[in-house]
């Protein structure tokens, strides 16, 4: 019998539990569900395994508090960290979650140095950078979940605006995973027709699209304000699954993710949301879009925001220099 891929989920909160459920339903691989809180991953694993009997899934799920159980993982998704609460920006979490990420990175380096790693923990662009520097993994094997989620929000709002199926919408969001992200209407389409062309046809207006762009930028904050006790987890989990599946199945999908740039877009040694091709070797290629002067200015502003955040935690990162 062919052995299933081993997928470890670091963090068993709302996103971690949802990830485990989706992986089980899609039968992408056997799961290790890790958390520092005793009983939580074990309880969720048992619940999910019982749910799997109803769905007909034979996926094995192990709950654990021991990092050694992630040994030999093919892929790891990291959600561990403090979640956002009302009034908090993603960036408010930086100090606490940097410490958590350093611990996770050390254990990934020790037990699963060949894994493909997807980081979800906020502030995303900084946390995935910490993971790279502290783990020493190759940059093509460490990415952050950002643009797929941001684009999913943009897709929904555009589908509602144009009254079409979400399956007809394909949007593009670049930059940091924060309030300065750059939703690109020019690279977003409805069944292949660019948004600016649809505006010219009278199907929407520049004003409406700008409102949608602003709502997309605040998409996570809108959910935090409504929930009051936490942040989004269904869409972030679904976004990470799309990235994971492209890696495990060598689908070579082009997805917008936080990728480590080494000169692309004029950016050096930073994680920024850009389109990348994901296959069995990890990041196969960074896709460089031709941006207008206005788009490039917005992108550069977003990059500067990421740089400033990195500066605030560089003393905590041993490999920064």
Swiss-Prot record:
Catalytic activity reported: (S)-malate + NAD(+) = oxaloacetate + NADH + H(+)
SUPFAM superfamilies named among the record's database cross-references: LDH C-terminal domain-like (SSF56327), NAD(P)-binding Rossmann-fold domains (SSF51735)
Binding site for substrate: 84, 90, 122, 153
UniProt entry tagged with the keyword Magnesium: no
Binding site for NAD(+): 11-16, 35, 97, 120-122
Active site: 177
Swiss-Prot/TrEMBL keywords: NAD, Oxidoreductase, Tricarboxylic acid cycle
One Pfam entry name: Ldh_1_C
One term of GO molecular function: L-lactate dehydrogenase activity
InterPro entries: L-lactate/malate_DH, Lactate/malate_DH_C, Lactate/malate_DH_N, Lactate_DH/Glyco_Ohase_4_C, Malate_DH_type3, NAD(P)-bd_dom_sf
Tree of life domain: Bacteria
CDD domains: LDH-like_MDH
EC assignment: 1.1.1.37
GO BP field: lactate metabolic process; tricarboxylic acid cycle
Role this protein plays: Catalyzes the reversible oxidation of malate to oxaloacetate.
HAMAP family: Malate_dehydrog_3 (MF_00487)
Family designation: Belongs to the LDH/MDH superfamily. MDH type 3 family.
The protein's name: Malate dehydrogenase
Originating organism: Rickettsia peacockii (strain Rustic)
Gene coding for it: mdh
């Amino acid at each position: 019998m062919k052995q299933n891929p081993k997928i470890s989920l670091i963090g068993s909160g709302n996103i971690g539990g949802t990830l485990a459920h989706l992986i089980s339903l899609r039968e992408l691989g056997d799961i290790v569900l890790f958390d520092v809180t005793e009983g939580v991953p074990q309880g969720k694993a048992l619940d999910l395994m019982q749910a799997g009997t109803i769905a007909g899934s034979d996926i094995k799920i192990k709950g654990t508090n021991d990092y050694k159980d992630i040994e030999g993982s093919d892929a790891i998704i990291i959600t561990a960290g403090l979640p956002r609460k009302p009034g908090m920006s993603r960036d408010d979490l930086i100090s606490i979650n940097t410490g958590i990420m350093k611990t996770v990175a050390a254990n990934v380096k020790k037990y699963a140095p060949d894994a493909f790693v997807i980081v979800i923990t906020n502030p995303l662009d900084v946390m995935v950078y910490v993971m790279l520097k502290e783990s020493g993994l190759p940059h093509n094997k460490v990415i952050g979940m950002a643009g797929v989620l941001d684009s999913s929000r943009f897709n929904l709002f555009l589908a509602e605006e144009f009254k079409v199926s979400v399956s007809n919408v394909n949007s593009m969001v670049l930059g940091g995973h924060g309030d300065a992200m750059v939703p690109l209407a020019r690279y977003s389409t409805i069944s292949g027709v660019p948004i600016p062309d649809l505006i010219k046809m009278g199907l929407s207006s520049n004003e409406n699209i700008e409102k949608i762009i602003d709502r997309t930028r605040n998409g996570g904050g809108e959910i935090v304000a409504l929930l009051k006790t936490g942040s989004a987890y269904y869409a972030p989990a679904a976004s990470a699954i799309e990235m994971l599946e492209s890696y495990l199945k060598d689908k070579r999908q082009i997805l917008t993710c936080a990728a480590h740039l080494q000169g692309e877009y004029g950016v050096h040694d930073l994680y920024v949301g850009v389109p990348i091709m994901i296959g069995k070797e990890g990041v196969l290629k960074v896709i460089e879009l031709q941006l207008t002067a206005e788009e490039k200015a917005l992108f550069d502003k977003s990059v500067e925001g990421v740089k400033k955040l990195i500066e605030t935690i560089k003393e905590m990162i041993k490999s920064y220099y």
